[in-house]
Every structure is written in structure tokens, then in C-alpha cells.
Amino acid sequence: MTPIPTDLNHFNGRRFNSYSNYFTKQFGGRVQKISIDAGFSCPNRDGKISTGGCTFCSNDAFNPSYCRPEKSIKQQIEEGIEFHQRRYRRANKYLAYFQPFSNTYKPLEELKSIYEQAFEAIDSHSPQFPPRNDMTSKALETPKIVGIVIGTRPDLVDEALLQYLNEIQKTHYVMLEYGVESVYDETLKRVNRGHDFATAEKAIHMTADYGIPCGAHFIFGLPGESKTMMLDAADIISQLPLTTVKFHQLQIFKGTKMAEEYLEHPEHFHLFDLEEYIDFVIDFAERLNPDIVIERFAGEVPPRYLVSEPWMKLRYDEVLARIEKRMEKRDTWQGRLYQDANHDM
């Protein structure tokens, strides 16, 4: 194995800035997200922005079986811990992850009530934070919940929400994750995203200004984007004050508008095969700011949801192992081609 350059020691022996290392530094061990469906909707579906939703969107494909809005947050946390302990058996700490749809799409007072059900799970038994005696525990009493992650759209945050989360993070870990998907406005319009990239930039900068950890999701392979365009996006993303990024290869989900377009005009789409994607995403990582944590290189959903062909039914861990092996073979790492005169590794 080719030694990691000495100036990349902060990668902890890997060739990219990994999510697991980030949370090991934060909490001293592996941390696993527990998805929670708190019954949120989306302005791109209910008519406020649009009624069609994003053409690629299928929330059911990403929701684990226990994650249902008719269940209380306490029950979902409890069942989520059990689910992940059976499946992974590696995590000893968990994040309550408000994932499906837009999890800031309610008035602030309602949001406080929802989020604090998860905060109370931390307060009940966690020794890591001081108790919040002003609240009565309604959620799972477990020492394993260490914080929350809130997934939402970049056009659904404002100063009042960020001020509230800024206060909360003095005693609890909080992260906001934005669905950005592309840096190109023409792409965002084509997939009916309902906002432009400038909106995402503004939200990310506002979040960072409040000192709140911030993540962003991007999809590789959206129609209309060439490989050069996608790689050039690394230079744009690298200038954002992001804590984490999550990458997904385009997958076509059954029942979506994009599935209809794909079946009618497959020539409009370039779907990566596994080997091509591995090299592509490494090329991308080479140009990415090494201070940005990579949560995921690729998406993983059950094949039954897909119109497009899955990658030999490989689990994400197997895909990641292949990516890291290829990085070793190419003797490369995240940020190798990143250029920023102000950056000091």
C-alpha cells in the first residue's frame, strides 16, 4: 500500500475526509443516523411552489421500515436503535435524523415542539450534556442519542430558525442538511427543484455564519449535465462553508416523473455503471476541498424501487471498499488537485 502523504494525517489513515472519522472526533466513537418521519410535507408538492415535486423524488425508497409518521418520535427512535443494532452492530451512539421531505416546513413554534422530543431523549440519560430541567421527557430514555440532524430545502430556513438552533447547539449537537442536488440552475429547473443555486448558497452561508454544522446533498448524472460539468462543480462546492457532503449517483425510481421521461427518452440519460462511477467520483474527490467531510460517495436503495439497473445489488460498504481500493491503486486522495491559495493542509 502506498503511504498516505504526511500532510494528510488528519484523514486518519484513509484517503478521504470520512464521516466516521468526523464523528469519532466529535463523540469518541462510531455514530449512526436514525431516520425519523415526523409527518412533514414539502412546498414543492403541496402547491406553495409546485404540485409535482422534484422529478427524481421518491422518499419511500430511503425510508427504513420502522420510519412511519403515525409512530411517535419516541417509538421511531426506539425501533431505529434496534434496527441498526441488528444490521450493523458497530455504532454505540446515534443521531436522530429528521429525513423524509422538508423538516423545517412548519411554523417555528411547531418545529420547536417536534425537535425537542428528540432533544429530551438526549437529556434524559446522556452524560455528555447538562440536563434541561425545563422539559419533561416524552421520547426514548436512552444515553445513546447524541444529537439531531435536520434534512430540508435551502429555501426553508430563515434567521429566526437559525437563531433558535444556534441556542440549542450550545447544549446539543445539531446539523442542518440541505438538498442542493446541482450547482447548475438549468438542471434545477429541469428537475423541477423549485429553487436556484443562489438560494442554496445563501442558506449554506447563513447556517455557517451561525456556527451550525451544515451538510449538502448532490446527485451525479442528472439529465443535461456532462461529465465535465459535474467535475467542475467540485470547484464551486469547495468554496462553500460546508461541513459535510453526500453524493448520490442518479437512480431512476419507479413512480416518479423522471421514470416516465427515462422510459420515453432513455437517450436523455447517462446512468453510470459501477466501474465508471468509481473513477468519476475519485476524479471529483481529487478536486474537492479536503476540509469537507464526505458522508457518502454513492446512494443505496432496495432494487425493488428502481427502474434503472442496480449495481449488482452491492451494499454501500462494498462500493466504498472498491472506491478506497481504487484510490490506493491510483495513489490519490481527496483534495490532491484542490487549489486554494488560502488553504493550508
Question: What are these model-derived regions, one by one?
Answer:
Residues 32-36, 94-96, 148-150, 174-178, ...:
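Hydrophobic faces of well-ordered beta-strands that scaffold small-molecule active sites
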Residues 1-53, 59-92:
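N-terminal [4Fe-4S]-dependent radical SAM core
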Residues 60-80, 87-108, 143-157, 173-199, ...:
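Core AdoMet radical
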Residues 1-21, 27-32, 244, 252-345:
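Auxiliary Fe-S-binding modules of radical SAM enzymes
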Residues 108-116, 158-167, 230:
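Distinct, well-ordered alpha-helical segments
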Residues 198-258, 275-298:
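Conserved C-terminal portion of the radical SAM core fold
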Residues 85-87, 118-122, 163-173, 205-209:
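Acidic (Asp/Glu)-rich catalytic clusters
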Residues 128, 132-141, 344:
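A cross-taxon signal for low-complexity, glycine/charged-rich
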